Amino acid sequence: MACVRSIGSLTSVNHSQRNVPRSGIVLSSCSVLPIKSSSFTGSPVSLPRAQPSSRTALRPMKPVSITMMVKPALQFIQGTDEMTIPDVKLTRSRDGSNGMALFSFDQPSVFDSSGEVGEITGLYMIDEEGVIQSTDVNARFVNGKPEGIVAKHIMRSPKEWDRFMRFMERYSDQNGLQFVKKQ
């Protein structure tokens, strides 16, 4: 799987005594879930490679990596952000080797659009580092009508815990959540 990252570089071109910036797009590997369908209907374009003239001297500089910011989001259906802010409960073992996050959604917006957009396939936690996925998702029903969703995410290593906490920090900053330690 590959993702697109923008790499900018400044190449000095001796043309009319000025510097001309250039940028490119580089494919690099990262952990991103594949998109099953897309509304993009573009067509491939081939551009001729620019050839510097004999009077032009190219002196490439080091490429500079540009980090693209992604708004942290929770999704039950890939591509459809959940608008309801959940109640999140965290537990962690005493030795820190594993932990669990329990997300409780009351009247999630996915119930309004799930028939039109698709089926709930899991809980996807998306931020600039990639996607964290949990498939342990259960709906609560009251009198035959969907009332809420409970999703469980299990972290089996300190590395998974740290990654989840980085996501939650970004998500809570974006949505005004606050960490309250149980007394």
UniProtKB/Swiss-Prot annotation:
Location within or outside the cell: Plastid, Chloroplast thylakoid membrane
GO CC term (a single one): photosystem II oxygen evolving complex
Membrane topology, from the record: Peripheral membrane protein
Transit peptide, residues from-to: 1-49
GO BP: any one term: photosynthesis
Matches recorded under InterPro entries: Psb28_c1_sf, PSII_Psb28_class-1
Keywords from the UniProt entry: Chloroplast, Membrane, Photosynthesis, Photosystem II, Plastid, Thylakoid, Transit peptide
Residue intervals passing through the bilayer: none
PANTHER family listed in its UniProt record: PHOTOSYSTEM II REACTION CENTER PSB28 PROTEIN, CHLOROPLASTIC, PTHR34963
Family assignment from sequence similarity: Belongs to the Psb28 family.
Subunit comment: Part of the photosystem II complex.
Protein's recorded name: Photosystem II reaction center PSB28 protein, chloroplastic
Organism: Arabidopsis thaliana (Mouse-ear cress)
Phylogenetic placement of the source organism: Eukaryota, Viridiplantae, Streptophyta, Embryophyta, Tracheophyta
Gene that encodes it: PSB28
